[in-house]
């Protein structure tokens, strides 16, 4: 269940009580299933929902002018993506599944409701985003200053930390 995966993920960032758990478990959304190697989002696409990953892996990436891809991050169970739909409707990146993926598609209005119902949840989601930004800063250093071996090692350690 996507809601349980989300609870596991955000529980790392805040001490949630039973009421917070209930708010998460009552999120209204539509189940979504995508096969392996499926483009879920194309850059420039109009966005209409936040997706919570239940099972599977995906990559968020940007396509460079010469056709190469720059992977921005890996999306794992419990991750949410496309929170920018809360303030902007067009995606500035693409998302493609690495494995088959199951998720929960949540309308922006429903996600805003969730944020207004619990200060702890708002803090947990904010802290989750702060951690993602920290990961992206590390990626900038990794790509700019580390050798290929160091980049791969750091990336694998980051994945290991997130999968646990």
Question: Where in the sequence are the language-model features?
Answer:
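A generic structural signal for short hydrophobic patches within well-formed alpha-helices
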Residues: 80, 111-112
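Conserved active-site beta-strand element of glycosyltransferases/polysaccharide synthases
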Residues: 104
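Cyclic nucleotide-binding regulatory module and flanking cytosolic helices
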Residues: 1-36, 80-81, 86
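Polybasic "coupling" helices that flank or enter modular domains
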Residues: 116-164
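Cyclic nucleotide-binding regulatory domains
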Residues: 12, 38-100
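Residue-level recognition of specific faces of alpha-helices
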Residues: 23, 49, 71-74, 94, ...
